[in-house]
């Protein structure tokens, strides 16, 4: 069971990083750090409008 949990955790991390890289190229600013992007994604789900250091705005 431990190996299954480990695989699931890795999948979640990879999915999160992929979604962050998508946001950084599509809607968010290039100077948005990864930690800030993670907070924005958690806060806004898939509706991040602005992501800058210390600033996170959701669209819609």
Curated annotation (Swiss-Prot):
Any Gene Ontology CC annotation: extracellular region
The name this protein goes by in its record: Potassium channel toxin alpha-KTx 29.2
Domain-level remarks: Has the structural arrangement of an alpha-helix connected to antiparallel beta-sheets by disulfide bonds (CS-alpha/beta).
Family assignment from sequence similarity: Belongs to the short scorpion toxin superfamily. Potassium channel inhibitor family. Alpha-KTx 29 subfamily.
Main location: secreted
MF terms in GO: potassium channel regulator activity; toxin activity
Origin superkingdom: Eukaryota
Disulfide topology: 32-51, 40-56, 44-58
Function as written in the Swiss-Prot or TrEMBL entry: Weakly inhibits the Kv1.3/KCNA3 channel (1 uM of thetoxin inhibits currents by 13.2%) and Kv7.1/KCNQ1 channel (10 uM of the toxin inhibits currents by 27.7%).
Native species: Lychas mucronatus (Chinese swimming scorpion)
Tissue distribution of the protein: Expressed by the venom gland.
UniProt signal peptide: 1-28
Coiled-coil ranges per UniProt: none
Compartments, record wording: Secreted
């Amino acid at each position: 069971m431990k190996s299954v949990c480990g695989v699931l955790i890795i999948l979640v991390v990879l999915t999160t990083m992929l979604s962050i890289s998508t946001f950084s190229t599509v809607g968010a600013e290039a100077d948005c750090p990864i930690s800030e992007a993670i907070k924005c994604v958690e806060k806004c789900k898939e509706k991040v409008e602005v992501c800058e250091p210390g600033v996170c705005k959701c669209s819609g």
